[in-house]
Design a protein with these regions (language model features):
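Structural beta-sheet core signal
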Residues: 40, 66-68, 136
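Glycine-rich phosphate-binding P-loop
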Residues: 133-153, 157, 182
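Conserved active-site beta-strand-loop modules that form the wall/rim of enzyme catalytic pockets
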Residues: 98, 148, 177-180
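Alpha-helical scaffold segments in soluble metabolic enzymes
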Residues: 106, 110, 146, 218, ...
Length: 307
């Protein structure tokens, strides 16, 4: 098989929409009517790809704040570009790391800014003490449970570094806010291979349904285009090796790491798992997989980014 020619053949066909996600979307359509606002967590490495068009549709008529979570894993300069992009579209947006308390405090302050009109009206009506009800939503594995625990100051939600941990809605109450945590949800069909690949790279699609070797090759090919020095430094690669076709590059890295089977062949599956795991753990360095597109408004976020 010619791995270089076929490396994108299957990524375009990635789909993952189990039944509980359809149920979650129906639940969100009901619950959005009873909250004051929505807080949409996006992955700071892929803000566009992690923006679920179904969540956008459901939350469109309520005040909304976007939080670019896992900002500690993303390229800080690119994250600043995204913040400007959202703000220029008059969309509230903050960059956070859910594991850090400062991120939760930034979100609380931003929610109050976004809802300043509502809070002022409540104060005029003698309801200044009423808690603000906010729906927390996003794609799987975007860090909602970790954020919720930091926001609440205690372990209220089960958190894990894999998609699909939160299965049902739950209310979490703090001094000023009642947060409705919704399970992570994707959408029925990814019409863009870029979106599907990006979601797979960060672990928002179950690894069990993916070809891990193809995933690792695609990831290497993507990252070395924009961050060649980080890949070269991590795996001690010279320029000639870094320029190899993706499969040969993966083999070269596996050989350097001693990931061999009997006969001296590289265990490419084991190498692929190592590569994906190290990227997700930020061992390659702080990397962003997409930059803001040249678009005029936030409505374009829901459109396909390419064929």
């Amino acid at each position: 098989m010619n791995n270089q020619d076929t490396r994108f053949a299957n990524q375009y066909a990635i789909q993952w929409f189990p039944g509980h996600m359809a149920k979650t979307l129906r639940m969100m359509e009901q619950e959005i009517q009873h909250v004051d606002a929505s807080l949409v967590l996006l992955d700071a490495r892929i803000p566009l790809s992690s923006l679920n068009p179904e969540i956008e549709r459901i939350t469109a008529r309520k005040p909304k704040l976007y939080a670019l979570n896992k900002a500690d894993l993303a390229d800080p300069a690119v994250t600043e570009e995204w913040i400007r992009y959202f703000h220029e579209a008059d969309a509230g947006c903050v960059a956070i790391s859910a594991k850090q308390k400062g991120g939760a405090n930034a979100v609380k302050a931003a929610i109050e800014r976004e809802l300043s009109g509502l809070l002022a009206r409540r104060q005029n009506r003698g309801m200044a003490g009423a808690k603000t009800q906010v729906m927390l939503c996003g794609i799987p594995n975007v860090g909602k449970s970790t954020f919720l625990n930091t926001f609440a100051g205690s372990a209220r939600a089960k958190a894990a570094d894999r998609p699909g941990v939160t299965k049902g809605k739950q209310w979490v109450s703090t001094e000023k806010f009642d947060l409705l945590d919704m399970p992570g949800v994707l959408w029925k069909k990814f019409d863009s291979k870029t979106i599907a690949s990006n979601l797979a790279f960060i672990g928002s699609i179950k690894d069990d349904i993916l070809d891990v070797e193809e995933l690792a090759m695609n990831l290497l090919d993507e990252v070395r285009r924009n961050y060649p020095d980080l890949v070269a430094q991590r795996y001690k690669l010279d320029a000639e090796t870094l320029a190899l076709p993706p499969y040969e590059l993966m083999e070269a890295i596996g050989r350097k790491r001693g990931l061999l089977v009997r006969g001296g062949e590289v265990n490419t599956e084991r190498c692929a798992v190592m590569l994906v795991d190290e990227f997700r753990a930020c061992k390659w360095g702080r990397i962003s997989l997409e930059r803001p597109p040249q678009r005029d408004d936030m409505a374009d976020f829901a459109e396909e980014d390419e064929e």
